[in-house]
Amino acid sequence: MNQTRVLLIFSWLTVATLLWMDWGKNKNETLEISASQNLGVDSNLELEHAVPQINAGAVPVQKDSQLIAVAPKVPVINVKTDVLQLKLDGFSVLAADLLRFPQSKDRGAKPIKLLTDDPNYPYSATTGWVSQSNSPVPNLSTFLPEQPGVSYKLANDQDRLVVPFVWTAANGVSIRRTFTFERGRYAILIRDEIRNGGETPWNAYVFRKLSRVPIPNILNRAMTNPDSFSFNGAVWYSEKGGYERRAFKDYMNDGGLNREIGGGWIALLQHHFFTAWIPQKDQASLYLLAQNGSRDIAELRGPAFTVAPGQSTTTEARLWVGPKLVEQITKEHVKGLDRVVDYSRFQLMALIGQGLFWILSHLNSLLHNWGWAIVGLVVLLRIAMYPLSAAQYKSAAKMRKFQPRLQQLKERYGEDRQKFQQAMMELYKKEKINPMGGCFPILIQMPIFFALYWVLVESVELRQAPWLGWIQDLTTRDPYFILPLLNIVIMWATQKLTPTPAGMDPIAGKMMQVMPLIFGVMMAFVPSGLALYWVINGGLNLLIQWWMIRQHADFSRKRSRGNIK
């Protein structure tokens, strides 16, 4: 296999892979527990509280029309921290704006609305209680703020803000719910304290759910739609099953999800942002995916609680509402939560992506520019792979030198391709030319290239991050197509330096001639950060190849003059 053919194969593999990433379906091969099966607690979990002994379908999802009919107007509390602005009604987080993430770079642009009470595309996070043994529980309208009509704001001298709600039943049972916010943090601690002031035991289980109507533009995958590049759907994590996911478009495949999990979490992902329920490690829950009309729901049911008269108990969970910031996610110390930065569903590619981002983030801390960090990453990778690349360049230089002899062989054997191939291989063997010399370095770069693609697509840290001049957002495509045009020029120049094999098939030769144009068109639709990587990498490759060819030519001239033996 010659170098030109290797480049051709690599090019078509790249195009095919990107097309697969654009149109391919995300499949999960998971074994789900039947929705009709009664769930108990795994004895190996050794949990204090049990998962409710119920069928997954025993508590049907209420229709939106039913909720509107039974729920009177509920007082809504406004809360503002340094990073979030929210609306709470005690039962749900109805809306959440991300104050540090504007929708665009335009002056005065509004912040990203992650949770929203938009009637067309509602997206909320809810936690409540379901009765067992006819115990009274709060409904949508009965969690009341302790200080009605008060708006809460995290003051400049505050690091912590607590927003309390309370529910009290006629029989003396009460639940005090607190939402705790911390400065600079997107994880909200929601804590319920149940006090039984009645005369009979109180039995109920807690549920926590995320519910949204997906916006159409995240369901329609297209190379011109940045929001569809990333995975959009539900993900969950367990000790046994690891990281699993289900796209919105495939939400109820295999019957949804119905599984008992301890020590995990569940989330809804979209481009750059996510919401997640993170329960206590020592409590098991029933993990569910369900649909209610146009709503997709990710829910945790359980644990169940029995509170004796005169006693009290507490349960708490974290609700993440925010961006996929690697540093902040790491600080939560939740196993597997770093996978929401979804570089790949494949563990190896995800690890490569995490490593590339680690290097990029450190380069950015030194250079204070994500674009120059990408340039620095290219330089480091070229240095690391130079020993491998040197063989590729030397092979190309030798191939270029022996092109006239290969052409002579082709003319000598004419249409007898078998004899021509035999003579060509004998020449390669005699002159110690390795036609596979350019293959391995290119194969090494393929996983790096694809992992970097997902790093640039997924990393919210690069969102709206400029490089210089016309590149003002490295996660969107080049607005003036300058980088794709540069890529065409660089690939064309590289082809001119690379010898065309004498025995190359004419059709393959024509395909190689149009390959720079194909790659240029493809680069017009990828993030400009990836196009920058490819242009810098190709430019360095061109310079090194030119230098190696020149060095080899000088060496050959000196040897022919007798200066080198």
Curated annotation (Swiss-Prot):
Q: Name one GO molecular function term.
A: membrane insertase activity
Q: Which CDD domains match?
A: 5TM_YidC_Alb3 (cd20070), EcYidC-like_peri (cd19961)
> Sorted alphabetically, which keywords does the UniProt record give?
Cell inner membrane, Cell membrane, Chaperone, Membrane, Protein transport, Transmembrane, Transmembrane helix, Transport
On whether Transferase is a keyword of this UniProt record, the answer is: no
**Keyword Transmembrane: yes or no?**
yes
In terms of InterPro entries, this protein maps to:
Membr_insert_YidC (IPR019998), Membr_insert_YidC_N (IPR028053), YidC/ALB3/OXA1/COX18 (IPR001708), YidC/Oxa/ALB_C (IPR028055), YidC_ALB_C (IPR047196), YidC_periplasmic_sf (IPR038221)
GO cellular component terms, alphabetically, are: plasma membrane
Membrane-crossing residue ranges in chain numbering: 6-26, 348-368, 370-390, 437-457, 479-499, 516-536
Gene3D superfamilies linked: 2.70.98.90
User: Any idea where this protein resides?
Assistant: Cell inner membrane
* Biological process according to GO: protein insertion into membrane; protein transport
- The superkingdom of the source organism is Bacteria
Pfam families per the UniProt record, alphabetical: 60KD_IMP (PF02096), YidC_periplas (PF14849)
Topology relative to the membrane, per the entry?
Multi-pass membrane protein
- Family, similarity comment: Belongs to the OXA1/ALB3/YidC family. Type 1 subfamily.
- NCBIfam families named among the record's database cross-references: PRK01318.1-3 (NF002352), yidC_nterm (TIGR03593), yidC_oxa1_cterm (TIGR03592)
Task: Provide the function of this protein.
Answer: Required for the insertion and/or proper folding and/or complex formation of integral membrane proteins into the membrane. Involved in integration of membrane proteins that insert both dependently and independently of the Sec translocase complex, as well as at least some lipoproteins. Aids folding of multispanning membrane proteins.
What does the subunit section of this Swiss-Prot or TrEMBL entry state? Interacts with the Sec translocase complex via SecD. Specifically interacts with transmembrane segments of nascent integral membrane proteins during membrane integration.
- State what protein this is by name: Membrane protein insertase YidC
This protein's species is: Xylella fastidiosa (strain 9a5c)
